[in-house]
Amino acid sequence: MKRTIIIICVIAICIVISITYAYSMYKNDVNQVQKFNNQFSKYIDQEFFGTELATIINLAIDNNEKNNIAKDTSGKYVTDDLYSVRVDVYMTDTQKTYSMETLNAGEISNLVNNYSNIQFKCTKVEYHKSNKRISYLYIEQIS
């Protein structure tokens, strides 16, 4: 009888430990996604200058490099279902939309020099369906 009670207690303790561990891992994942999204979400529907645009592009490129996101034949990052981030920027003075790769290829320092006093606004954001991480930002020049 004692042996049966001990076995049941050990099984119950193992189940509680497993549930606690799973919940802890889930909360850790949620916190990491929230921390990642916070880097970009402060720019959503807000006006900011060209220097901040350079920061956004650098964050997106650093994320893609860190997560080994592949590039296509034109040098643009391929969208995946988990970690990729894309940024497109519409410039009113040229009436064209540029990808972050195009702007980065023209050197971020040139972007900062030419657009540091120009205002931009992030008007569209998309999230990965699988993990709710930011996957796409559309930014428009507003002045």
Residue ranges and their predicted role:
Residues 23-143:
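N-terminal export/assembly leader peptides and their processing motifs that target proteins to secretory
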Residues 5-21:
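Hydrophobic membrane-insertion alpha-helices, especially the h-region
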Residues 1-3:
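Positively charged n-region of N-terminal signal peptides that target proteins for export
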